[in-house]
Amino acid sequence: MDIDPYKEFGASVELLSFLPSDFFPSVRDLLDTASALYREALESPEHCSPHHTALRQAILCWGELMNLATWVGSNLEDPASRELVVSYVNVNMGLKIRQLLWFHISCLTFGRETVLEYLVSFGVWIRTPPAYRPPNAPILSTLPETTVVRRRGRSPRRRTPSPRRRRSQSPRRRRSQSRESQC
């Protein structure tokens, strides 16, 4: 079976493969980030979003993989064989988990459309010959939000209220929810 874990989110393994392996933070850093930003939603019995579900599954898979690695470390007596297994897990499985964690954390943090736009931008940048591309790669956190807003058919929000409107005495409600209640 050829299963692409990103397909339902509009991405693909191939799209993420444009990012170099050293682009992705360590699994420990990604787990710490997921915990710091989304612990409540991840531990909640409620369904929050497909990204939360995918994050839960990736975290559980990594935990089981670490249990297996511990077992192999304890039961495989040949040091060379043990080193081969550890190296394979870190290089191949570790990278896949790092990609999964990064993708879903980024989608929850920046929004799926922004992450997909970033992946496409980076893919175009990396495939463009160095002589014809800008010196710096695109950066996820600096992509303009207006692209996403315009794609939905809205004009960018004004910075100042219209003089005809009366200001409400109550604080204005934010459109996005706080990180604590990410569902």
From Swiss-Prot:
It is found in: Virion; Host cytoplasm. Gene3D superfamilies: Viral capsid, core domain supefamily, Hepatitis B virus (1.10.4090.10). Sequence repeats lie at residues 155-161, 162-169, 170-177. One of its GO terms (cellular component) is host cell. Phosphorylated by host SRPK1, SRPK2, and maybe protein kinase C or GAPDH. Phosphorylation is critical for pregenomic RNA packaging. Protein kinase C phosphorylation is stimulated by HBx protein and may play a role in transport of the viral genome to the nucleus at the late step during the viral replication cycle. Its main location: virion. Residues 177-183 are annotated as: RNA binding. One of its GO terms (molecular function) is RNA binding. Belongs to the orthohepadnavirus core antigen family. This is Capsid protein. It comes from Hepatitis B virus genotype B/C subtype adw (isolate Okinawa/pODW282/1998) (HBV-B).
